[in-house]
Amino acid sequence: MDPCECSKSGNCNCGGSCTCTNCSCKSCKKSCCPCCPSGCTKCASGCVCIGKTCDTSCCQ
């Protein structure tokens, strides 16, 4: 289950590796945000974002 409460509060912070604001993933080192930035494919495990770009290779 996703440890973040972004869908409820609009904000989350997962162990310092991911920050999600207004359901917008700003920076992720691993899958932890239930929301993805525009242009990022959402994976079953969530979304892995490096910077503000995301492609199939960053999903795990």
Curated annotation (Swiss-Prot):
Span list, region Beta: 1-28
Function: Metallothioneins have a high content of cysteine residues that bind various heavy metals.
Region (Alpha): 29-60
Residues the entry annotates as binding a divalent metal cation 5: C33, C35, C36, C49
Residues involved in a divalent metal cation 7 binding: C49, C54, C58, C59
Family of this protein: Belongs to the metallothionein superfamily. Type 1 family.
Residues given in the record as a divalent metal cation 1 binding sites: C4, C6, C20, C23
Ligand binding (a divalent metal cation 4): C32, C33, C43, C47
Annotated protein name in UniProt: Metallothionein A
Organism per entry: Chaenocephalus aceratus
Gene name, Swiss-Prot/TrEMBL: mta
Residues engaged in binding a divalent metal cation 3: C14, C18, C23, C28
